[in-house]
Amino acid sequence: MKNLYQILCDEIEPWRKSRYQSQFSEVVEILKFNKNESNYLRTAQFNAIETYLFLRFVKETPKIIDLYKEYFKNLEDFVEVLGIKHINQYNIRFFETLDDVLKDLLNPGVADQYKYDALTETLNLDYPSYILALAMGSGKTNIISAIIAIEFAIAIANENKKSEFNFIKNALVFAPGLTILKNSLKNIALLPFAKILPPHLLNSFLANVKYTFAGDTDRLLVVQKESQ
């Protein structure tokens, strides 16, 4: 059985062949620019950004549990892919729906015995949460910077259009320590954005973006009023 990532790859393939059809033309432009003209991003970096944009602008930012429900509708597959150990071929008949399985995970006795805390926390997040896992040295900081630039550029391009899409206007990036903040994270502002964004999107992005690097004693961050 394929895992979630493999299924997403299968879903992205026809989207790629359709030349990235999207309700937002900027998504198409940016992906084509990076794939056919810029060639700045490594293959793994481009694939990560491509997957992210598919989830954001095609699937419209689903929660993780919604993805699992969509792609693993069969109870046996759902239980297997999530690594739920206490439900097996003998007792699965007592569960009628996927929600029955999720409800059972919250049973204190079951959760404690099978150590489902991390799983239930992930599945019950009330916001979308994605992990783009790449090897050390593969350029994760550049991916973060590129995603921020792409999100902001699309938001700016559509700010005067009537759309109910939840555009991003602020991004908060955490670092595990001051060493990472000083030596790596500040490179977010140094990405050659001309190699990520087409010229007509680049200028408006550069004119509007503002970076704030918080110190270890800072308690407040200044953001645009009523921005998301």
Regions found by a protein language model. Give the residues of each.
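RecA-like P-loop NTPase motor core of helicase/translocase proteins
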Residues: 1-228
